[in-house]
């Protein structure tokens, strides 16, 4: 009997002890879980969401824009517009400094009007030096002395009431290659802005080479190669001084004048051009485009 009671006491003691340990562990574990849960909540609360960050950045930018004065906004947009203009204009200028222009606005317009044009590109080495000197003497005697815009020629044109042009060969190249024909202040402004850029990138020899290949020298006749064969039946490297001077007289009015059938005025003008070509060769004003 005593043994049985002692056995029961032992079992009851073990049960109570186990229950006590279990309660103790539960009591210990509950605060730990609560602590961990609170820690996780605080961590989540301390970390702002990506969406929140983006919204705060956007709000900051909008506030910064709002703080900008109209003058600053205008400066910013003008700066961007200027940068865009420089990129758009410099790329073709750089490209055509090494690649020959495939066509021009005038050539394309005449091709559409006439159905065909006479034109073949030739390097300046295959063009008689007399033609280069004649064209410079006739169109822009100070070609080697200015940076694209000739102030003296502009003043002379204004004094003459606009009866004669003040455009340099460089300006004519810009107009022919990059712009369009016709008179407008907008085109003239673009031409004035782009000409110094061409002068800064191209050599004078390259400018003259392009001019001699794209200039209109007769109805549907463009460039030295086509003009030499059309009027005289010779190659551009075989032109005489007189033939070169006659071609130069055609340039101001290529649709009305013919180098093969010169008028009295054209013959007189050709003689003046021959003298001018000899002068710029002697005084060094042809040095920038001749070897």
Task: Locate predicted features.
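Short, low-complexity intrinsically disordered segments enriched in A/P/G/S/L with frequent Arg
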Residues: 3-8, 14-23, 27-30
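Juxtamembrane regions of bacterial inner-membrane/periplasmic proteins
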Residues: 31-291
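Residue-level detector of alpha-helical transmembrane segments in integral membrane proteins
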Residues: 1, 7-9, 24, 85, ...
